[in-house]
């Protein structure tokens, strides 16, 4: 695969439409359930199916979530907006139109900043403009039998459980230039939505779906090229790979004298390429007009201000604070703040007295390894933040070794025990009494007279051997600093 870096003078222009399922218990215009995984066509009713005589009523929790999402993305929330009907005919749309927002969306003109870490390049921050956020209803889902798409299938089934679920569609400006930037942007959008609690952002379940619009041009000042829409990417790595493939495909096509046509393409994860799906529609094809069953949306200033005060500290602000105030590296801050429960656990442990860097190392190292191995989350383990802080303080004070702390960690996580109590119960406290350590070393050296003689004759590497035997004899409990000091005192003393 040829990357854009190998095509001198070419630039990619990328924008992303992110469809976020808002995590309300009921759908956007009806009380039908939004529960994922229920039997097909059980979460439907006459409103979802568009039966004659039914009228939609806006779910106020959807409005709240959409406004909070807009505020977190620095969008300007409109005092007045409306719903429109987007006309198109497809089996997954029972009404033959989708209720969306066209020329008066709920919010416009925002931005977020994303941190881009390219391989072998320094991390940089880039501001990505956001054109708009609008509310709309989701469509149903087609299940193709005999193929993963309509072409080649024996027949198709329709599940309308997803139809009518509330979506916030977030449309970026064409400010992205690489697949990596596109993936980081989408990841930051999901992170923000999760921090807000307005969506779980689960890409595998379709809670967050991204459509990428991409074109290439010869130079930064050249007009935009013909854009291609890419669908069917269910991970951030897929977004990056799809962009990189499509950039190379378009450049190759243009260099070969081929014409790029405006179309929608699908990303094939197995083959690692995009394939043509259909020609791309334009806005006029949908024949938008105001929905006559839904009145205008008016959001009073008091209500907007109340929702604004409920916003949490957002990921970018939290990352910056961890670096500036707690001294974490940019990398550590990114990892700790990636999921809100981990960040909350981290802050609770800091409050309980843990040193920030040591705490970050434990969370990113042994604890994350345990979580991954046992397929659990930080919110599900029994080890409380205060108990992890206690463990770190015990290590810092020299009361236990890091090795012993690692050994008892699984039991602490599984049982939620006090580290001090467990250490006392198992007799694992560090031996730091000088006289006790001296006595143990003298007894130990008496077992290795030849090695002691060799050390005194200049074979100083044997010090490591003696330390190893001492740790073995004390089960790793002898204080290393004190032990080394006393060991050298005895070994360097005269044989008499």
From Swiss-Prot:
Q: Which GO terms describe its cellular component?
A: glutamyl-tRNA(Gln) amidotransferase complex; mitochondrion; organellar chromatophore; plastid
**Domain of life the protein comes from:** Eukaryota
User: Catalyses which reaction?
Assistant: L-glutamyl-tRNA(Gln) + L-glutamine + ATP + H2O = L-glutaminyl-tRNA(Gln) + L-glutamate + ADP + phosphate + H(+)
Give the E.C. number(s): 6.3.5.-
Which keywords, in A-to-Z order, does the entry hold? ATP-binding, Ligase, Nucleotide-binding, Organellar chromatophore, Plastid, Protein biosynthesis
List the InterPro entries. Answer: Asn/Gln-tRNA_amidoTrfase_suB/E, Asn/Gln-tRNA_Trfase_suB/E_cat, Asn/Gln_amidotransferase, Asn/Gln_tRNA_amidoTrase-B-like, GatB, GatB_C_1, GatB_Yqey_C_2, Gln-tRNA_amidoTrfase_suB_CS
* GO biological process: one example: glutaminyl-tRNAGln biosynthesis via transamidation
Family assignment from sequence similarity = Belongs to the GatB/GatE family. GatB subfamily.
Q: What does this protein do?
A: Allows the formation of correctly charged Gln-tRNA(Gln) through the transamidation of misacylated Glu-tRNA(Gln). The reaction takes place in the presence of glutamine and ATP through an activated gamma-phospho-Glu-tRNA(Gln).
- Please name the HAMAP family in this protein's record: GatB (MF_00121)
The entry describes its oligomerization and partners as:
Subunit of the heterotrimeric GatCAB amidotransferase (AdT) complex, composed of A, B and C subunits.
Q: What is this protein called?
A: Glutamyl-tRNA(Gln) amidotransferase subunit B, organellar chromatophore
Q: Which organism is it from?
A: Paulinella chromatophora
Which lineage?
Eukaryota, Sar, Rhizaria, Cercozoa, Imbricatea
């Amino acid at each position: 695969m040829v990357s854009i870096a190998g095509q001198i003078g070419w630039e990619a222009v990328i924008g992303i439409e992110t469809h976020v399922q808002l995590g309300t218990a009921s759908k956007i215009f009806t009380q039908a359930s939004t529960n994922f995984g229920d039997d097909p066509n059980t979460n439907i009713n006459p409103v979802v199916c568009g039966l004659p005589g039914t009228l939609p009523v806006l779910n106020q929790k959807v409005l709240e979530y959409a406004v909070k999402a807009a505020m977190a993305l620095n969008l300007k929330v409109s005092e007045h907006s409306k719903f429109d009907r987007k006309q198109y005919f497809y089996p997954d749309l029972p009404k033959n139109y989708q209720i969306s927002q066209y020329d008066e969306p709920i919010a416009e003109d925002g931005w977020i900043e994303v941190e881009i870490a390219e391989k072998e390049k320094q991390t940089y921050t880039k501001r990505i403009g956001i054109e708009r956020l609008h509310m709309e209803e989701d469509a149903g889902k087609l299940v193709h039998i005999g193929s993963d798409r309509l072409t080649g299938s024996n027949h198709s089934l329709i599940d309308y459980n997803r139809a009518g679920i509330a979506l916030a569609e977030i449309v970026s400006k064409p400010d992205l230039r690489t697949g990596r930037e596109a993936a980081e942007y989408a990841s930051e959008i999901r992170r923000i939505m999760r921090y807000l609690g307005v969506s779980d952002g689960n890409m595998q379940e379709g809670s967050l779906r991204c459509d990428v619009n991409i074109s290439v041009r010869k130079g930064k000042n050249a007009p935009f090229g013909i854009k291609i829409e890419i669908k069917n990417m269910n991970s951030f790595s897929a977004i990056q790979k799809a962009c990189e493939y499509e950039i190379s495909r378009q450049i190759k096509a243009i260099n070969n004298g081929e014409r790029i046509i405006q179309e929608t393409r699908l990303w094939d994860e197995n083959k690692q390429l995009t394939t043509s799906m259909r020609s791309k529609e334009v806005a006029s094809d949908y024949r938008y007009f105001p929905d006559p069953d839904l009145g205008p949306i008016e959001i009073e200033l008091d209500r907007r201000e109340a929702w604004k005060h409920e916003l949490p500290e957002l990921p970018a602000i939290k990352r910056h604070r961890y670096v500036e105030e707690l001294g974490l590296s940019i990398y550590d801050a990114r990892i700790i703040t990636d999921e809100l429960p981990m960040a909350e656990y981290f802050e609770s442990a800091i409050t309980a007295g843990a040193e920030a860097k040591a705490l970050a190392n434990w969370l990113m190292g042994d604890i994350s390894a345990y979580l991954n191995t046992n397929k659990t989350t930080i919110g599900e383990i029994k080890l409380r933040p205060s108990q992890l802080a206690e463990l770190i303080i015990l290590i810092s004070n020299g009361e236990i070794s890091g090795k012993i702390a690692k050994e008892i960690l699984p039991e602490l996580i599984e049982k939620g025990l006090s580290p001090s109590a467990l250490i006392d119960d198992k007799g694992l406290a560090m031996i730091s009494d000088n006289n006790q350590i001296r006595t143990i070393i003298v007894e130990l050296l008496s077992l290795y007279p030849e090695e002691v003689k060799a050390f005194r004759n200049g074979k100083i590497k044997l010090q490591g051997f003696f330390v190893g035997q001492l740790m073995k004899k004390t089960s790793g409990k002898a204080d290393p600093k004190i032990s080394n000091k006393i060991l050298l005192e005895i070994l360097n003393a005269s044989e008499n």
